[in-house]
Amino acid sequence: MASATDTVSAGSTPRDKVVTRFAPSPTGFLHIGGARTALFNWLYARHHGGTYLLRIEDTDRARSTDAAIDAIFDGLEWLGLGGDEPAVFQFARSDRHAEVAHKLLEAGHAYRCYLTQEELAARRELAQAERRPFRIDSEWRDATPDQWPADQSYVVRMKAPREGETTIVDKVQGSITVQNSELDDFIILRSDGTPTYMLAVVVDDHDMGVTHVIRGDDHINNAFRQLVIIRGMHAIEGGWPDPVYAHIPLIHGADGAKLSKRHGALGVDAYRDEMGLLPEAVFNYLLRLGWGHGDEEIISREQAVAWFDIGDVNKGASRFDLKKLLNLNGHYIREADDARLAALVAPRLATLAPGFAPDKGLDLLTRAMPVLKVRAADINELAAGSVFLFAQRPLAMAEKAASLLTDDARAILTKVAGVLEAENVWTTGVLEATVKQMAEELGIGLGKIAQPLRASLTGQTTSPGIFDVLALLGKDESLSRIRDQAA
């Protein structure tokens, strides 16, 4: 049991090696806040040459699903945040958790509590009526075995200290003090003998060798209760040092409200599959949510590992800004390898462009990337922008594009087809020079040719540079599309 006045200081317990952990509950997909927690744990371990572990807290059997577990692992791997060792599954360790509970019980740090649900409800109502906090004050706390009733179910509660105070010097939040009188005798074993979350977390962290507990600041209150267990076990057998705590602030929406889907907060899988974001962009954006290095906005993984320290994380809540994330993704799209982008775009073209065949179209898609990615903010935009390359003739015309194809414009296209037919060198530069010369000879502006030409080649009013489009489509396909729309 913890002593009356205790302080656990960040860094007060010497360890040979930093060990962090990310411990999600598989009751839903990996959300953006969880991904950032994983990132900070991964970075802190990497920065200190330590180990980063994963634990699946699947004790809520009714809500835990295999699909959620798979999505968590998939999302972490996509972000490059897979664990250094095989993941630990909490439910499988229930016997170990119960073993620790019985040690605490036998040593007098915990006790059997026979209070019924009706008794607890009555005491809770009385506390509400008297407008005071409800605290468990069980008459069973100091009962002896001969006083235990036969054939009556019980829970096992920790004996929380009642006098003095406990202070945690948190790596992020600083010094936090709680009066021990505010701690209640919380349950560690339910009446059916199953361990509670509060106990399981402590036992797993100890057995996994976790030295630094980095998690959301909604767990601050849990830390004081978990220390009661830790110090109880340390008093019994030693070797249960206090962890270093770092409670990071939650993420809010741009309006300061609790983060939700309306702010663009989705599961990590949705950022990849639905929004078409790159993992390096999400990694970089999450890194900058509550932490920074000067004015640096673009930070590589290597730089992040070198610069990151958990003590530099802001205390205040960060605000999620979807627009900034998309802008950052656009930067990484432009920096990305063309073949990689083409491979990411290809699956989306199965529905967008029926004429796309991966075995034949991937090379063209790769060659088109340098001009396509200049305008795109995500993989979806890249896919949409590349559809014209694989469109089937005759092209379906967007309404605005069709409006450009007047009789005069179609007559110009006929002349363009004739001039280009004679061109033997089919490159962007040569094609541009040829069309510009034609415009001069006709005494018209380049736009008078370029606009209907774009419509005939793409079916749209916007596209990459028109001469890039001609070069990518090739001579035969370009001339066929132009003649489809010519007078």
Curated annotation (Swiss-Prot):
**Motif segment ('HIGH' region):** 24-34
**Residue span of motif 'KMSKS' region:** 258-262
Catalyzed reactions: tRNA(Glu) + L-glutamate + ATP = L-glutamyl-tRNA(Glu) + AMP + diphosphate
- Compartments where found: Cytoplasm
What job does this protein perform?
A: Catalyzes the attachment of glutamate to tRNA(Glu) in a two-step reaction: glutamate is first activated by ATP to form Glu-AMP and then transferred to the acceptor end of tRNA(Glu).
* EC number annotated for this UniProt entry: 6.1.1.17
- What biological process terms from GO does the record include? glutamyl-tRNA aminoacylation
User: What InterPro entries does the record tag this protein with?
Assistant: aa-tRNA-synth_I_cd-bd (IPR045462), aa-tRNA-synth_I_codon-bd_sub2 (IPR020751), aa-tRNA-synth_I_CS (IPR001412), aa_tRNA-synth_I_cd-bd_sf (IPR008925), Glu-tRNA-ligase_bac/mito (IPR004527), Glu/Gln-tRNA-synth (IPR000924), Glu/Gln-tRNA-synth_Ib_cat-dom (IPR020058), GluQ/Sye (IPR049940)
Quaternary structure, per UniProt, is: Monomer.
Q: Does the keyword Membrane apply?
A: no
Q: What is its main location?
A: cytoplasm
GO terms assigned for molecular function:
ATP binding; glutamate-tRNA ligase activity; tRNA binding; zinc ion binding
Q: Where does ATP bind?
A: K261
| Enzyme class of the recorded protein, top EC level | ligase
* UniProt record similarity statement: Belongs to the class-I aminoacyl-tRNA synthetase family. Glutamate--tRNA ligase type 1 subfamily.
What is the name attached to this protein's record?
Glutamate--tRNA ligase 2
Q: Would you tell me the Gene Ontology cellular component terms? A: cytosol
- Note one Pfam family from the annotation: Anticodon_2
- UniProt keyword annotations, A-Z: Aminoacyl-tRNA synthetase, ATP-binding, Cytoplasm, Ligase, Nucleotide-binding, Protein biosynthesis
Task: Cite the SUPFAM superfamilies for this sequence.
Answer: An anticodon-binding domain of class I aminoacyl-tRNA synthetases, Nucleotidylyl transferase
Disulfide feature: none
